[in-house]
């Protein structure tokens, strides 16, 4: 074990699944398929063995957070302020963050039937393409400087304070912020924040997004596996774009497959891999839990902070 993981407890999947014995998955295979991202690989068995124990762990953290909030209110002689339990989820492009986020949202809603569970991605806080082009940063999209961190931190601060907050909406189909569209959140019970940058803050080293989290997860995998998943996803996106002229990826559909793959490999190496190695992976030890995936997308190891 490297020094990076010295503060984590390493748990095998076999041991992890025994920590929670419920076998009812809380959703159907059809529902699971509907929330699974392109080229991801997950089944009901994964839900039972990995995600149900995780839901149970999150409940433990939520109870602890509520107890602390109550005790602090007594100490300060103030009324308890109802605020969301915020979960941050990070990891590389194409590692499966979106599938995990949507699955947790569904499972939390099924477990806490009277609670509201919302999901927001940090993609919405990217600067619009027009701004990136103006500042010659379009080729840095996804890197720390391409995010409006002030807007993102203000959003988190508002949500954490129990107030109504709005977030911009990003579309992967148009590869840009959707004009005049907002996602509004009114003091949900749970808020999941998903993005490659949720443990970063390049503008203010004294304040991290993770300061607002009650629980945090990093989705991990070997970079050469993630590259393969990225290439597979890129080809799937090209197939979808063939019949949609408005889709950003339509411009690449006329390329021969070998040229399309070469282009995707270049993007991976010069943008996504560099971003992963310099800015994303170095933040993973800020997570409370690390889910490690094997080559087949299956979670094989879990690291829980001691």
Swiss-Prot record:
Catalysed conversion reaction: (R)-pantothenate + ATP = (R)-4'-phosphopantothenate + ADP + H(+)
Biological-process GO terms, alphabetical: coenzyme A biosynthetic process
Recorded GO CC terms: cytoplasm
InterPro entries assigned to the protein according to its UniProt record, in alphabetical order: P-loop_NTPase, PanK, PRK/URK
Location(s), subcellular: Cytoplasm
UniProt superkingdom: Bacteria
Keywords recorded for this protein, A-Z: ATP-binding, Coenzyme A biosynthesis, Cytoplasm, Kinase, Nucleotide-binding, Transferase
Residues reported in the UniProt entry to bind ATP: 91-98
E.C. number: 2.7.1.33
Involved pathway(s): Cofactor biosynthesis; coenzyme A biosynthesis; CoA from (R)-pantothenate: step 1/5
PANTHER family reported for this sequence: URIDINE KINASE
Family to which this protein belongs: Belongs to the prokaryotic pantothenate kinase family.
Protein name listed in UniProt: Pantothenate kinase
Organism this protein belongs to: Streptococcus equi subsp. zooepidemicus (strain MGCS10565)
Gene that this sequence comes from: coaA
